[in-house]
C-alpha cells in the first residue's frame, strides 16, 4: 500500500496537526505502509523546517498566505480578504501537488489531504482521495468534502462533523509515544535556571485561536499570589511580538520564557521541568500536546472547548475552565501550584491514562484499516459495470 500525504504547511510550521501526522507516518511505516509527503514553501524564501530524514518528501514552491492570514485575520474589514487569500493559496497548492503526482511513474494507492478541503474536487479521479479534518470546515467546502472517498477525523470533531457535512466520518483517535514522553529522565530546571520556580508549561503555536493573551493575564493574576511562577511557552508563531509586548505591559516579562519551537525529542525534558501543563485555546479538537503532558505525569489546566474532554476527565486528570475566563484559569493553576500532593496525584493518574488508553501502534493500525477499506471500495467502484443509457 502506497499513500501520498498532502500537507501544505509541514515545511513552514509545526503545530499539532503536523506533529500527529509525522507520528502516524512513522507508525504506519512499521506496519508496511509506504508513505511520501508533498508539502510547500513560499515562492520567495526558504522552508523553515527541512524534510524529515526518514520520510520521503517533495517540497513545492507556491504562495504561502497563512502568515498573512494569521497577522491580519483580526483586523476590522480583513475577514473576507484573509479567507480568500487562504482559499487561493490552498487551491493552487492542491493543483500543483496533483500535477506532480501525475508526472510520477507510479501512482499512489491513495492520497490523504490534511485540511485541504478542496482536494476531492481537484483530484484527477484515478485514485481515491481522503481528507483529514482537524475541525469544522467552512460551509463553502461542504460540496467539495462530499465528493471525497473518505473523511477522517478524531474525537470531538469526528462526532460533530457527520451532521454538518451529511456523510460518515471515520474516527481515528490519536496516540502518544509513552516511551519518549515519560516522567523519568532529564529535565531543564538546572540548565534554564528554574530551580525553586513554579513552572507552567504551554506547548502550542503562537496564533490567535490559542488565546495566549488570556493565558498571560492569568499568569499575571497567579503571580500576585505565587511570585515564583514562570510560564514556559514552547512554540513559534506570528503573535510572538504581540505577546512579548503584552507580557511587558502586564509586568510579567521576566516570568515568561519564549522558548521557541522544539523537536519532539527535545520537548520531554521541558515537560519534566514543569509543575502543570496549560492550554488556553478558544478551540482545539483533540490536541496532541495534552496527551504528551499527561504521559509525562503533569496535571492539565485547559479551556473547556472542542475535544479536550476526550482526554481530560475532571477532576481526575485536571481542570477545564470556561473559554476566555482568565480568573478561573488562574485559580485552577494556583490550585496545583500551591498543592504539590494534589499535582503529583493527578500526574500519576494522567500517566496511567496515557499508557492504558492511547497508543500510536493501535491508532496506526486503525488508520491502515481505513485506508485499505477506501482503496478496496474505490477499486470495486471503478470495476463495476456501468449502465448504458437506452
Give the location of each predicted region.
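Nucleotide-activated donor-binding/catalytic signature segment of Leloir-type glycosyltransferases, i.e.
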Residues: 244-261
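Conserved acidic donor-binding segment of nucleotide-sugar-dependent glycosyltransferases
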Residues: 314-315, 319-326, 335-340
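Carbohydrate-associated surface elements
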Residues: 157, 175
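Short hydrophobic beta-strand element within catalytic cores of glycosyltransferases
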Residues: 299-302
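A short helix/loop element that forms part of the nucleotide-sugar donor recognition site in Leloir-type
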Residues: 182-194
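Short alpha-helical donor nucleotide-sugar binding micro-motif in glycosyltransferases
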Residues: 261-262, 269-274
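Aromatic "clamp/platform" in nucleotide-sugar-dependent glycosyltransferases that forms part
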Residues: 282
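A conserved mid-protein helix/loop that constitutes part of the nucleotide-sugar donor-binding site
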Residues: 19, 23, 198-224, 231-233, ...
Amino acid at each position: 500500500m502506497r499513500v501520498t500525504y498532502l500537507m501544505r504547511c509541514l515545511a513552514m510550521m509545526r503545530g499539532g496537526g503536523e506533529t500527529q501526522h509525522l507520528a502516524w507516518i512513522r507508525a504506519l511505516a512499521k506496519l508496511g505502509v509506504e508513505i511520501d509527503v508533498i508539502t510547500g514553501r513560499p515562492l520567495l524564501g526558504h522552508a523553515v523546517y527541512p524534510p524529515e530524514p526518514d520520510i520521503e518528501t517533495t517540497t513545492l514552491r507556491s504562495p504561502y498566505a497563512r502568515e498573512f492570514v494569521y497577522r491580519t485575520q483580526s483586523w476590522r474589514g480583513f475577514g473576507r480578504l484573509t479567507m480568500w487569500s487562504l482559499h487561493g493559496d490552498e487551491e493552487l497548492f492542491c493543483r500543483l501537488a496533483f500535477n506532480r503526482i501525475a508526472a510520477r511513474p507510479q501512482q499512489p494507492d491513495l492520497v490523504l489531504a490534511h485540511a485541504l478541503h478542496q482536494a476531492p474536487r481537484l483530484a484527477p479521479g484515478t485514485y481515491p482521495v481522503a481528507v483529514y479534518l482537524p475541525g469544522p470546515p467552512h460551509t463553502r467546502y461542504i460540496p467539495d468534502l462530499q465528493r471525497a472517498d473518505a473523511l477522517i477525523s478524531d474525537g470531538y470533531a469526528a462526532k460533530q462533523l457527520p451532521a454538518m457535512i451529511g456523510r460518515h466520518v471515520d474516527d481515528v483517535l490519536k496516540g502518544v509515544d509513552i516511551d519518549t514522553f515519560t516522567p523519568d529522565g532529564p529535565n531543564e530546571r538546572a540548565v534554564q535556571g528554574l530551580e525553586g520556580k513554579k513552572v507552567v508549561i504551554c506547548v502550542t503555536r503562537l496564533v490567535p485561536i490559542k488565546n495566549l493573551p488570556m493565558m498571560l493575564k492569568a499568569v499575571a493574576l497567579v503571580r500576585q499570589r505565587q511570585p515564583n511562577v514562570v510560564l514556559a511557552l514552547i512554540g513559534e508563531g506570528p503573535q510572538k511580538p504581540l505577546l512579548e509586548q503584552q507580557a511587558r505591559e502586564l509586568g510579567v516579562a521576566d516570568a515568561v520564557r519564549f522558548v521557541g519551537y522544539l523537536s519532539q525529542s527535545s520537548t520531554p525534558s521541558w515537560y519534566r521541568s514543569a509543575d502543570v501543563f496549560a492550554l488556553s485555546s478558544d478551540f482545539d479538537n483533540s490536541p496532541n500536546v495534552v496527551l504528551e503532558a499527561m504521559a509525562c505525569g503533569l496535571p492539565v489546566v485547559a479551556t473547556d472547548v472542542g475535544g479536550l474532554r476526550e482526554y481530560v476527565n475532571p477532576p481526575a486528570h485536571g481542570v477545564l475552565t470556561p473559554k476566555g475566563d482568565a480568573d478561573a484559569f488562574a485559580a485552577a493553576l494556583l490550585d496545583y501550584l500551591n498543592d504539590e500532593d494534589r499535582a503529583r496525584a493527578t500526574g500519576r493518574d494522567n500517566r496511567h491514562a496515557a499508557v492504558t488508553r492511547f497508543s500510536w501502534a493501535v491508532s496506526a493500525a486503525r488508520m491502515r484499516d481505513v485506508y485499505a477499506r477506501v482503496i478496496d471500495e474505490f477499486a470495486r467502484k471503478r470495476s463495476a459495470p456501468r449502465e448504458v443509457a437506452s
